[in-house]
């Protein structure tokens, strides 16, 4: 089957923003104007098409990235039909994983900002992710009808706070209640949208007289930026002082694709003004799959050489699975982006990450949560497959004869953990299945069982993240859970060296028990664990009983002497003892060794150890004092500070795990969400006396 839309007319874009910038409303308008939805859905009514989870409709925020496909011919019908694959992404900091994996497979993005609140902390996070994947982007300053809206102030913020070379292609006519439309700086005309038909029709008018000078000034800026694209344009601009509309667009497109400029437009999605102009900008200035760098991967050969897949239907098939979702009707949906080649329903492909073949049972095009079955997908397409068994987020799918492993996505380590247990014993198995499915969908969500407490511990990116997953277990899987606080896994060790006697003698007629040992106990090297040394000479303890002595000591390592936590890093030397010809046996020596070990551990200056986490906080310089002060209050040891991306600072510290609960929320409120952090286990350190005292009292 031939391709319906040429790949040059594809646009794979994400709509990204901070919470409440109006990005879902913007997407709803896009669906309305491109003819996909006949009635506009409003977020505040809980009726938005893209927010399809019950919780999203209740909370008015977007949790998962919904993918949809639409077609656009331009505001004036000036283009041939272009296919736009859109992914709507969440703006809440707990769901940055969704933004990260969307940007990995997109070619361009529209960043939506609020006209009154401008660049928000979460915008900085999203911006860093866009920079990481070098995604060409344009900005839509939304909510120009809001109190305090100021388009040029937001443009200035883009320059100062994000270091962006922001170039307006529109100017706002009026603001707040007086917002009427926009000035198109390329055409030098005012655009007014018709309120009576929800902005479906519009008219070009003369620029208001009081804005003429300002418009000319900003147009001059626009032309000079476009002229920087190449020598030919620059020469013409220097000679004639102007460029044609077409030349301006060519220059702006080249510089946008090179990530040298960020084009800015404005409007009010809620008032149906400006969204069609953004769609035109997507087509005119954002790349098709053939205009972005070809994807690279590792070939399946001895040298693991670099392989390249260009956006071509004739090339071998390659795709990246970027999201797994559970659908109540069809089971597992695997969202994937095709980078090269063609795949049809029923075809088998290879997953080099898992080393398994997979078969495409059904392929569907998604419109929010509505599915439309299709027979094939080609280079540049984004679709979902039903029936893939062992694919997880970030896996490559490719032609079995031309194996390539595309670069895997990086996912942040979870930063907050809680213990969960089902409300009824009968739900234990159901909870296990539910957690398994949720973990398969979301790589930033982890499930583990604590070996010591037996608790199921779930970990994620923040409290809201875990709240929503617990709520989903209840709604989608019918499992109600009690959520507790996780227990910190402390340890114990000894600091001194002692020689101790262990004696177990029971001789009162009949067969008795006799075991007698002398042990030397001392601290072992950090991380060396338990070490047993046999220095018996002359057979004072018979050879056959020595393994029992070691076993008796080893078993005592599992329960410490201060608070019952496992002991770490102890060296035990068996150097003397005695035995009885009749009454000595393995059990007697094992018990004698246990008693001696316990007595020795109590005498050898035992201490409690607490897990220390390596914490790395990325923060704007302005918040660094607050961040460092807070880490010090948490008994953290600052290891150093480095330069971070976009003028931020990175603070490295070693902090006790017990002090890190609630840190995600505290850091967010202290820095208005502008800082982010990662945390991993580093080592065990001796707990201060007061802390150790509290731990012993609570056991």
Curated annotation (Swiss-Prot):
Disulphide bridges: none
Entry coiled-coil feature ranges: none
All copies of the tr-type G domain together span 8-290
Gene3D superfamilies attached to this UniProt entry: 3.30.230.10, 3.30.70.240, Elongation Factor G (Translational Gtpase), domain 3, P-loop containing nucleotide triphosphate hydrolases, Translation factors
Q: Where in the cell is it found?
A: Cytoplasm
GO biological process assignments: ribosome disassembly
- Family matches, as InterPro entries: EFG_II (IPR041095), EFG_III (IPR009022), EFG_III/V (IPR035647), EFG_IV (IPR047872), EFG_V (IPR035649), EFG_V-like (IPR000640), EFTu-like_2 (IPR004161), G_TR_CS (IPR031157)
CDD domains found in the cross-reference section? EF-G, EFG_III, EFG_mtEFG1_IV, EFG_mtEFG_C, EFG_mtEFG_II
Which annotated residues bind GTP?
A: 17-24, 88-92, 142-145
Keyword check for Cell wall biogenesis/degradation: no
Alphabetical UniProt keywords: Cytoplasm, Elongation factor, GTP-binding, Nucleotide-binding, Protein biosynthesis
Q: Pfam families in the record, alphabetically?
A: EFG_C (PF00679), EFG_III (PF14492), EFG_IV (PF03764), GTP_EFTU (PF00009), GTP_EFTU_D2 (PF03144)
Broad class of where this protein is predominantly found: cytoplasm
What molecular function does GO assign, one term? guanosine tetraphosphate binding
Nucleotide-binding found in the keyword field: yes
Protein family (similarity comment): Belongs to the TRAFAC class translation factor GTPase superfamily. Classic translation factor GTPase family. EF-G/EF-2 subfamily.
Q: What does this protein do?
A: Catalyzes the GTP-dependent ribosomal translocation step during translation elongation. During this step, the ribosome changes from the pre-translocational (PRE) to the post-translocational (POST) state as the newly formed A-site-bound peptidyl-tRNA and P-site-bound deacylated tRNA move to the P and E sites, respectively. Catalyzes the coordinated movement of the two tRNA molecules, the mRNA and conformational changes in the ribosome.
- Spell out the protein name for this chain: Elongation factor G 2
Organism the protein comes from: Colwellia psychrerythraea (strain 34H / ATCC BAA-681)
Taxonomic lineage from the root:
Bacteria, Pseudomonadati, Pseudomonadota, Gammaproteobacteria, Alteromonadales
